[in-house]
């Protein structure tokens, strides 16, 4: 397998609400898509929003979850100040901050917000990480 991530697909409870969050709160550019799915191009990786029940059916698993989905998504920025600024912007637009920006044990600066379906996004600055 080539080391490449093509899509991150989030099973959402309300496609219209989730699409609005990612477009208006995070400012992601939406790609023209069919009505049952929304795509956002994030460089070489695409973010897909798909109804949770349909995604579960496609994967052959039950749609009911236990709460924490078992993963987080991360967005790295170029400075600690950018972490705090982005979290402030998300909060100002109605996003829910889960953890304010704070110094991390590994030497960077990190915080978390949740989208309307509870998916956790880490916003991080890592001085050791060249791919920001």
What name fits each language-model region?
Residues 57-63:
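Short beta-strand/turn micro-motifs at beta-sheet edges
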């Amino acid at each position: 397998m080539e080391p490449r991530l093509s899509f991150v697909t989030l099973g959402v409870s309300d496609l219209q609400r989730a699409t609005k969050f990612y477009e208006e709160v995070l400012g992601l550019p939406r790609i023209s898509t069919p009505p049952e799915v929304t795509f956002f191009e994030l460089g070489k990786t695409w973010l897909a929003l798909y109804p949770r029940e349909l995604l579960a059916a496609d994967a052959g698993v039950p749609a009911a979850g236990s709460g924490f989905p078992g993963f987080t998504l991360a967005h790295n920025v170029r400075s600690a100040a950018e972490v705090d600024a982005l979290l402030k912007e998300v909060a100002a637009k109605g996003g829910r901050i889960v953890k304010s920006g704070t110094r991390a044990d590994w030497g960077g600066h990190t915080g978390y917000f949740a989208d309307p379906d509870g998916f956790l996004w880490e916003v991080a600055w890592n001085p050791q990480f060249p791919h920001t």
